[in-house]
């Protein structure tokens, strides 16, 4: 019997373990951290052996194949040992893809992928299609393949997941944009990160579709290198060469495969970045044959994504917006661009090799004050202090950051949490960071 070892027992790993067990493999799960009770219960209910708090190498190095959590770097010592002895190391998505014939709509990009994924899922669900949501959001793809049957899966993919995918094929691949992110995981080499993102197109055939932002200079440059077989569906803000989806005369237009249009003001999501998300989602739904009426309705009644430009409250004339999901500089750029009032920006956290010059002009134009929130704020001081804005340095946590921002903000201004950084210095996750922000805003 083939032995499969799963490293990491979160949503992805626990789901992969269940699928491996259901398919008759000898299955073992190992996690360096504590495993959440709900995942222990899931593993126990399927009689899957597991360990937590350490990796027992002799129980791992004898695997025929290893499924790795996306959070474990490819250069982790244990992964290097496995690769050195020739043991295949794959992702949960790669493993799950072997056991389903469902259509795969896969979304990646440095920014916008969660909103776009959620919006595509909303359109498909609203059209009464049998659809699952998986990848970075929703339920583990492997668990759904093991326990449910869907005709379509809408899958958000990070570069870390794509790194360990080899034979998986996306029927529709969506690439929103490529800007510097996670460079700490890619030896601070931008090309390594770009190559990871473009893995979403590998194995695509002439029957498949590749949807991408036509104005992204990196994507345009890379297209020529990759010799893609898939049919190309570029989108842009305005009508231009090659774009099959754009806005013209305040109207959203998609010209292929079926002509579609709707008034831009009817879109539920506002702001330039959300226009791109809506265009990519509209093309995906159009390709799946969803009716124009269903696409229009779903694009106009979508409720948005938590922690992404989420309006929290207005306190004594000051608006508070939670954009905790902005874990890179480009995400913050989009958030600042959408601000219509003077803004107190809360930023900081675990820096991933950030270049803050991208937001320099917007910070100078839009911000009235800055709150640095993190254990190590030296880089923020070095870059932003010269702007001459009032600054608060907070190293203790979200409560103090919210109170500092509230004191700095004037009536009619906005406090924006858009950190540019990962959350792991002071918080468990970007969700934890956003939840704490909302909690302390509501306590003001």
Predicted regions mapped to residue ranges:
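N-terminal leader/targeting and accessory segments in enzymes
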Residues: 1-91, 95
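Residues in the short beta-alpha loop(s) of Rossmann-like NAD(P)-binding domains
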Residues: 10, 33-35, 137, 215-216, ...
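Nucleotide phosphate-binding/pyrophosphate-handling subdomain across enzymes
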Residues: 3, 15-23, 262-367
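Residue-level signal for inorganic ion chemistry
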Residues: 20, 66, 107, 136, ...
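Phosphate-binding loop of NTP-binding sites
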Residues: 21, 58-61, 70-214, 218-229, ...
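C-terminal helical cap/extension that packs against the catalytic core
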Residues: 39-40, 357-413
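Beta-strand->loop->alpha-helix junctions that form or flank phosphate-binding loops
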Residues: 51-54, 90-94, 227-247, 298-300, ...
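Short internal beta-strands
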Residues: 26-32, 210-214, 346-347, 366-375
């Amino acid at each position: 019997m083939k032995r499969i070892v799963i490293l990491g027992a979160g949503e992805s790993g626990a789901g992969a373990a269940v699928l491996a067990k259901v398919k008759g493999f000898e299955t073992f799960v190992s996690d360096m951290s504590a495993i959440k009770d709900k995942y222990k219960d899931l593993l126990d209910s399927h009689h899957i052996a597991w360990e937590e708090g350490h990796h027992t190498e002799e129980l791992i190095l004898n695997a025929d194949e290893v499924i790795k959590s996306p959070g474990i770097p490819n250069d982790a010592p244990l992964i290097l040992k496995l690769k050195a002895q020739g043991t295949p190391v794959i992702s949960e998505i790669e493993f799950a893809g072997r056991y389903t014939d469902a259509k795969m709509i896969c979304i990646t990009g440095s920014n916008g992928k969660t909103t776009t994924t959620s919006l595509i899922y909303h359109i498909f669900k609203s059209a009464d299609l049998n659809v699952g949501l998986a990848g970075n959001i929703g339920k583990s793809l492997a668990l759904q393949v093991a326990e449910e049957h869907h005709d379509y899966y809408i899958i958000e993919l990070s570069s870390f997941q794509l790194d360990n995918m080899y034979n998986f094929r996306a029927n529709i691949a969506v690439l929103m944009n490529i800007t510097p992110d996670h460079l700490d995981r890619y030896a601070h080499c931008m090309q390594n990160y770009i190559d990871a993102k473009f893995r979403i197109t590998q194995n695509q055939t002439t029957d498949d579709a590749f949807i991408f932002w036509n104005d992204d200079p990196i994507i345009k440059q890379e297209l020529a290198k990759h010799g893609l077989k898939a049919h190309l569906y570029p989108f842009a803000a305005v009508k231009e060469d090659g774009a099959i989806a754009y806005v013209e005369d305040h109207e959203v237009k998609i010209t292929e495969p079926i002509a579609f249009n709707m008034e831009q003001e009817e879109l539920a999501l506002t702001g330039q970045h959300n226009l791109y998300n809506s265009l990519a989602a509209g093309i995906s739904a159009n390709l799946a044959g969803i009716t124009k009426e269903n696409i229009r309705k779903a694009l106009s009644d979508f409720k948005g994504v938590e922690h992404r430009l989420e309006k929290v409250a207005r306190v004594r004339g000051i608006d508070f917006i939670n954009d905790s999901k902005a874990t890179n500089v480009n995400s913050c750029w989009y958030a600042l661009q959408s601000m219509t009032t003077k803004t107190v920006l809360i930023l900081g956290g675990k820096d991933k090799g950030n270049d803050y010059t991208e937001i320099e002009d917007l910070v100078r134009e839009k911000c009235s004050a800055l709150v640095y929130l993190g254990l190590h704020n030296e880089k923020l001081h070095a870059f932003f202090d010269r702007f001459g804005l009032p600054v608060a340095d907070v190293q203790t946590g979200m409560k103090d950051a919210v109170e500092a921002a509230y004191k700095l903000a004037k009536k009619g201004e906005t406090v924006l949490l858009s950190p540019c950084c990962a959350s792991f210095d002071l918080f468990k996750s970007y969700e934890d960071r956003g939840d704490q922000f909302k909690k302390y805003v509501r306590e003001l």
